[in-house]
């Protein structure tokens, strides 16, 4: 039986900077992702892809707000912006994959618009933490804050300021059974894009969307557990996770067990909003039945699956 691998692709891997926001730039970036997936398929894995949408959903939301203010067009709720980016990014990945798969194999890629259930009383709704959209300078942030007093901003990794929105914890992947069925039919599945569309249960038992952006690494780990994946791969901007990052004693991690990684986390080696959610997602996946987590760059992913690079987190 093939091993099932769930791979999380960062939204910043598709929009790398403010100069690369066009659909044309994103489509080119996605082609590199498709080439990597093709190499993984050659190694005989079943694959599910998830992706971030931080830059994209912020752009969509800002576009809707400007259109509303200038032209009186209806506002698009944040949850719908998440759904829009799921479809848009999923389409780009799906098309790039299917163009390659048609030449090299029999598998097909398909995108599943995915809802993720959250708790309506999650404290994340009261304390926005998820950065979205473009980076702003000090003066741009001040101008936006003046025009939108209810917005919150954070300084993001020395690159400028970004707007932050609510980010509740994912509780259940609504479409997990459908994703699992598609895997069994031989599809490469793209799902839970942007962390999934956040929904809550009403008193009547219906699903209702809420305005938030769920952390895609936490949703990916939850999806991996619900479909019984063997390996979780989280791609990021560094080849290996490091402790003492950016300091003279910086040390890259090759193979680490749960206990050691938990200690590093408790010692504060992983900053919130960047590496920390990836580590939390990794440990949760392993503690609830996963075999292995790999953290590396998209480019190094095939080599990491062969054990040649990347940070590998294991149970013991």
Swiss-Prot record:
UniProt GO molecular function: carbamate kinase activity
Keyword Transferase: yes
Keyword Protease (UniProt): no
CC annotations in GO: cytosol
Pfam families: AA_kinase
Transmembrane annotation, as ranges: none
Record InterPro entries: AceGlu_kinase-like_sf, Asp/Glu/Uridylate_kinase, Carb_kinase
Keywords: Kinase, Transferase
UniProt-listed GO biological process terms: arginine deiminase pathway
Family in the record: Belongs to the carbamate kinase family.
NCBIfam families (UniProt xref): PRK12352.1 (NF009007)
PANTHER family the record matches: CARBAMATE KINASE, CARBAMATE KINASE-RELATED
Name the record gives this protein: Carbamate kinase-like protein YahI
Protein's organism: Escherichia coli (strain K12)
Lineage, opening ranks: Bacteria, Pseudomonadati, Pseudomonadota, Gammaproteobacteria, Enterobacterales
């Amino acid at each position: 039986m093939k091993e099932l691998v769930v791979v999380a692709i960062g939204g910043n891997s598709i929009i790398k900077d403010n100069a690369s926001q066009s659909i044309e730039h994103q489509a080119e970036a996605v082609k590199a992702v498709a080439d990597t997936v093709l190499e993984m398929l050659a190694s005989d894995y079943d694959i599910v892809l998830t992706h971030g949408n931080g830059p994209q959903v912020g752009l969509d939301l800002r576009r809707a707000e400007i259109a509303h203010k200038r032209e009186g067009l209806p506002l698009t709720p944040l949850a719908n912006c998440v759904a829009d980016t799921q479809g848009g990014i999923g389409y780009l990945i799906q098309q790039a994959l299917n163009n390659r798969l048609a030449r090299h194999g029999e598998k097909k890629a398909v995108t599943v618009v995915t809802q993720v259930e959250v708790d309506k009383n999650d404290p994340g709704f009261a304390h926005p933490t998820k950065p979205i959209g473009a980076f702003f300078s000090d003066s741009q942030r001040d101008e936006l804050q003046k025009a939108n007093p209810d917005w919150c901003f954070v300084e993001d990794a020395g690159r400028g300021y970004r707007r932050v929105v609510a980010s509740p914890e994912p509780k259940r992947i609504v479409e997990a059974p459908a994703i699992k069925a598609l895997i069994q039919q031989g599809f490469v599945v793209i799902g839970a894009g942007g962390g999934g569309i956040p929904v809550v249960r009403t008193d009547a038992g219906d699903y209702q969307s809420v305005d938030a952006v769920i952390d895609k690494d936490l949703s990916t780990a939850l999806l991996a557990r619900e479909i019984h994946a063997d390996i979780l791969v989280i791609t990021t901007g560094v080849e290996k996770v490091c402790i003492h990052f950016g300091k003279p004693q910086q040390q890259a991690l090759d193979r680490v067990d749960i206990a050691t990684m938990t200690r590093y986390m408790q010692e504060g080696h992983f900053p919130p909003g960047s590496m920390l959610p990836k580590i939390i997602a990794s440990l949760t996946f392993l503690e609830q039945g996963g075999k292995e987590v790999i953290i590396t760059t998209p480019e190094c992913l095939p080599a990491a699956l062969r054990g040649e690079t990347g940070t590998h987190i294991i149970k013991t």
